[in-house]
Amino acid sequence: MSNAAAPATEGPDRSDAPAHVAIIMDGNGRWAAARGLPRAEGHRRGVEALRRVVRASHELGIRYLTIFSFSSENWSRPASEIGDLFGLLRRFIRNDLASLHRDGVKVRIIGERDGLESDICALLNEAEELTRDNSRLTLVVAFNYGSRQEIAKAAQKLAREVAEGRRDPATIDAETLGAHLDAPDIPDPDLIIRTSGEQRLSNFLMWQAAYSELVFVPIHWPDFDKAALEGAIAEFARRERRFGGLVAKTAS
């Protein structure tokens, strides 16, 4: 994308917003079924919702937005649906990457790339390379991602270091393992949102979600918009985050 304009670098100061929001974008198929439409149309409308939420995240002062784009378990879906999802990813990167770059969005990809089609890998690499110096909003795309697989891969890296004599196993702790995950430089999510009313993480950021606030909203992903995001943030703001401890009492 050599014709992309120079990106913006700073976002608004909104101290009330969570720094990192992660979203499980669920309900595209059910949204389509409720309207008598093919599942592919639900996924297409889901991409439109993603555009809205990326824009809203910047406007609300969110610094990191992680989206669960394609789970490692999604390979069990019909081949035609997988083809539709990959086609949407191709079009999204080709059509939206220049505008994301212009708006100062940095794209990061987490997940397993081995086994993906070569053109998909090339597009993912292009998105990261073009936007690597942007700082207004970091969009983390979890693609072909599974949290258990991510943790297992981190354990394998540590095991190799021990086997090669580069690490004493006694030095391995939670911080060490966390540093071997896919994106250790990105802070853990403050808020995880799941659409469609389902109340589970589905193998998404299970390590990073240790102290995240979880908000489950009943609407399907294609209907999610800035107002819905603001509602989830308002619920987040009402929570008392304890991080395993007690909330300090104010003096009366």
UniProtKB/Swiss-Prot annotation:
- The protein's Enzyme Commission number: 2.5.1.-
SUPFAM superfamilies the UniProt entry points to: Undecaprenyl diphosphate synthase
- UniProt-annotated binding residues for Mg(2+): 26, 213
A Gene Ontology BP annotation from the UniProt entry: polyprenol biosynthetic process
What's the cofactor?
A: Mg(2+)
Per UniProt, where does substrate bind? Answer: 27-31, 39, 43, 71-73, 75, 77, 194, 200-202
Q: Which parts form a coiled-coil structure per UniProt?
A: none
* The keyword Phosphoprotein appears for this protein: no
- InterPro entries in the cross-refs: UPP_synth-like (IPR001441), UPP_synth-like_CS (IPR018520), UPP_synth-like_sf (IPR036424)
**Which of the seven top EC classes does this enzyme belong to?**
transferase
Q: Where is the active site?
A: 26, 74
Question: What is annotated about its quaternary structure and interactions?
Answer: Homodimer.
Q: Which PANTHER family match?
A: DEHYDRODOLICHYL DIPHOSPHATE SYNTHASE 2 (PTHR10291:SF0), DEHYDRODOLICHYL DIPHOSPHATE SYNTHASE FAMILY MEMBER (PTHR10291)
What is stated as this protein's family in its record?
Answer: Belongs to the UPP synthase family.
Q: What is this protein called?
A: Isoprenyl transferase 2
User: What species is this protein from?
Assistant: Bradyrhizobium diazoefficiens (strain JCM 10833 / BCRC 13528 / IAM 13628 / NBRC 14792 / USDA 110)
